Amino acid sequence: MLSAEQVEKLVSTRIIVFGTGGVGSAVCNFLVRSGISNLTIVDFDTIDITNLNRQLVANQTNVGKLKVEEMKAQLLNINPNAKITAIAEKYDENSTIDLSQFDIIIDCIDDIKAKKHLIMQAKANNVYILCSMGAGNRYAEIPKFEIADISKTSYDPIAKILRKFCAENRINKLDVCYTKQKATKFDCKTVASVVYYPVMMAGTIVAKVITKIVG
């Protein structure tokens, strides 16, 4: 299906993924299974029992362990020859990660402030960034996600915040993955999630990334 040249592009492309939760863990899994062999993953969190329903990194044996270390082990089990770098830290304005060394940044962070900072740093370093929007509080429809410029998004509350942010900071183009499907309102402060929404979002993100790389 792919030429030797296209496969080499997948192997050599340097990707960094921020966040290894419901969306991020599936993104990492799909990237490596698609031939990506140079991957850096960033997350500060540990695996919780509540992650079992939707995060592909989580299982009964690794509750309490660092997500990035467990994710790295899982990915190397898929491709032992891959170069997987795990960074166990919370991304914020104090981060010292050199984004200029990467070809593609994938943002799967929940924290809005961190998202904004990461977007600004990606643009400052002229590195392509693809951001995930909301996948929670949805369950009753077959998931439908799309990639669009932030200015073209609707319905998504995270995208609404970022549209304003990008306009204020004169960011003319930002690719995001989002859904027009409206979230269900619950009497609960915690955002609920079922596995097929974040995984379908991850599949959409990876499809965009792979096609961008191979042309």
Q: Which residues fall in each region the model found?
A:
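Adenine nucleotide-associated cytosolic modules
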Residues: 1-215
